[in-house]
Amino acid sequence: IEKDQWDSIDVEVGMHEYPLRSFGGTGCTCNGRHFMGTGFYRFSLDWWAEFDGKHWHERTPVPGKTRTLAASAATEQYIYVTGGTHYGGVNTTGEVLADIRRYAPQTDHWTYVAVLPEGLINHVCFTIGKRVYIGLGETSDWQINDKLYWFEE
């Protein structure tokens, strides 16, 4: 990026208003396709969408409890969405989630993978080859997590 020169694009919504007005979502690129979702707008969200550079295309929502502050990462075939906080509304304290969900872009299908040893928020998720790493961040009792977990596809 040269001397802080940024370009912006006008995004045509094509979906409900809340995806673009939410915060705390997650997103990543899988095999050249760009996905994002979850987040918070009055309550935790489960939406999932593909962005082609100009238009949003609604996809199958993330199953399980709605979430904000989740993390995601992709391998060549799948996207993994992990952890986050479930808020049922603005007056709830939230529940830190520990589940791992796998999304297959080629079939628009979600699969439950596993439960982490503890719920995590503000954490990282990344891949090296077929190994998925999840950790750091904060636990359900707001303690700093110094663990990094991993599994292989």
Indicate where each model-derived feature is located.
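Kelch-like beta-propeller repeat domains
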Residues: 1-153
